[in-house]
């Protein structure tokens, strides 16, 4: 892999996202967005990856990511998603959801639309109204789904002032993240280790399926769906474990993979090469998981700068009887036969790596050490 380039940006980065390339386009992405948190003034920013430069004083490569534009954001940026080429949706710790519009002609961002009280607490234990953080968003034009600390799920449509659908008491605990399983189904993860599937075609406030971690009810912080096999879902939790789920069968994960030493903040399947998966953690690490069958001799060791530590996997379900070619490499991982290769992508441990995104050969991540890291050569 080409060197990973760092740029120090004087703000803690909570979210990083590549701008999608137009469908059918052969170009690689050039632009990414970031959101910040825990700063005196937070903002949403757009960057161009530009040229990569020289060695810095620490011996690392200094990236020449150019700031295109930024705009103030009220509250911490809890999540960030591109809605389309021009619009970015941001979730705030104030409970507000904002759509920002990028104007490429003069390189500015403006507020395009806003739902100021998408998430809020009510009831005897809170004032008659108090804001609740919006913790996660997912977009599928023209729809935006949001989840929050208030256990509420909202379905918004761009250009509609009010929510199209709200499930007020979707969860009695905090919802941490959401993604589409297949339209109009979504999957959410919560603070008591549950993965729930919701179908917007059904009325009422009950999920159509609940899966959960057995035992300790470890909070789940992140979720992603396999881009080709929509029944395969990955989650990461407070204990740093990576869980792989098959929502067609059972109520527990298919496999649990021992991973980070602290909270896993994000997990992403590579959108066009989903045998590759990426995770980042509070422990300051960013990992590339390779489950592809054509990888060289698989090793059960985790490689990082000459050090290795053992890698643990145990499968919780038997895949017998399922035609092997139809089984995702993530479901067929038998530790006795297959190995998943894990590579640490950052040159050294840092403060929390809060967010990552992958698109084509490009990866970006953001940290509490006020740095953004980028590589454009993931698989070389």
Swiss-Prot record:
UniProt superkingdom: Eukaryota
Residues the record lists as N-acetylmethionine modifications: 1
WD repeats: 8-57, 72-110, 119-166, 170-208, 215-255, 259-299
InterPro entries cross-referenced by the UniProt entry: WD40/YVTN_repeat-like_dom_sf, WD40_repeat_CS, WD40_repeat_dom_sf, WD40_rpt
Cell compartment(s), UniProt: Chromosome, Centromere, Kinetochore; Nucleus, Nuclear pore complex
SUPFAM superfamilies, A to Z: WD40 repeat-like (SSF50978)
Subunit structure: Component of the Nup107-160 subcomplex of the nuclear pore complex (NPC). The Nup107-160 subcomplex includes NUP160, NUP133, NUP107, NUP98, NUP85, NUP43, NUP37, SEH1 and SEC13.
Function: Component of the Nup107-160 subcomplex of the nuclear pore complex (NPC). The Nup107-160 subcomplex is required for the assembly of a functional NPC. The Nup107-160 subcomplex is also required for normal kinetochore microtubule attachment, mitotic progression and chromosome segregation.
PANTHER family from the UniProt entry: NUCLEOPORIN NUP43
Protein name: Nucleoporin Nup43
Provenance organism: Mus musculus (Mouse)
Gene: Nup43
């Amino acid at each position: 892999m080409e060197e990973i380039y760092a740029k120090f940006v004087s703000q803690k980065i909570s979210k990083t996202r590549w701008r999608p390339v137009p469908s059918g386009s052969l170009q690689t992405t050039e632009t990414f967005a970031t959101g910040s948190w825990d700063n005196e003034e937070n903002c949403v920013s757009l960057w161009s990856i530009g040229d990569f430069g020289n060695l810095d004083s620490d011996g690392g490569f200094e990236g020449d990511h150019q700031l295109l534009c930024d705009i103030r954001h009220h509250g911490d940026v809890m999540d960030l998603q591109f809605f389309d080429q021009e619009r970015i949706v941001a979730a705030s710790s104030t409970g507000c959801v904002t759509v920002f519009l990028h104007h490429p002609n003069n390189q500015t961002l403006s507020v395009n639309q806003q739902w100021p009280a998408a998430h809020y607490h009510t009831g005897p234990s809170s004032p008659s109204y108090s804001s609740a953080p919006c913790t996660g968003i997912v977009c599928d034009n023209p729809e935006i789904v949001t989840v929050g600390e208030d256990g509420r799920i909202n379905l918004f449509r761009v250009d509609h002032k009010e929510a199209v659908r709200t499930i007020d008491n979707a969860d009695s605990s905090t919802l941490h993240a959401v993604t589409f399983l297949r339209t109009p189904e979504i999957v959410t993860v919560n603070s008591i280790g549950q993965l729930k599937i919701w179908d917007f075609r059904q009325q009422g406030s009950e999920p159509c399926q609940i899966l959960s971690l057995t035992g300790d009810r470890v909070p789940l912080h992140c979720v992603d769906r396999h881009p080709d096999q929509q029944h395969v879902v990955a989650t990461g939790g407070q204990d740093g474990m990576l869980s792989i789920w098959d929502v067609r069968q059972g109520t527990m994960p298919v496999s649990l993979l021992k991973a980070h030493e602290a909270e896993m903040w994000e997990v992403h399947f590579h959108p066009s090469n989903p045998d590759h998966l990426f995770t980042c953690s509070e422990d300051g690490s960013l990992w590339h998981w390779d489950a592809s069958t054509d990888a060289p001799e698989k090793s059960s060791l985790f490689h990082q700068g000459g050090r290795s530590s053992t890698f643990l996997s145990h499968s919780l379900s038997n895949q017998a009887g399922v035609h092997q070619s139809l089984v995702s490499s993530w479901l067929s991982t038998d530790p006795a036969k297959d190995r998943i290769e894990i590579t640490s992508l950052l040159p050294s441990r840092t403060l929390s790596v809060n967010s990552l995104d992958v698109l084509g050969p490009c990866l970006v991540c953001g940290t509490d050490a006020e740095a953004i890291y980028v590589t454009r050569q993931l698989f070389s």
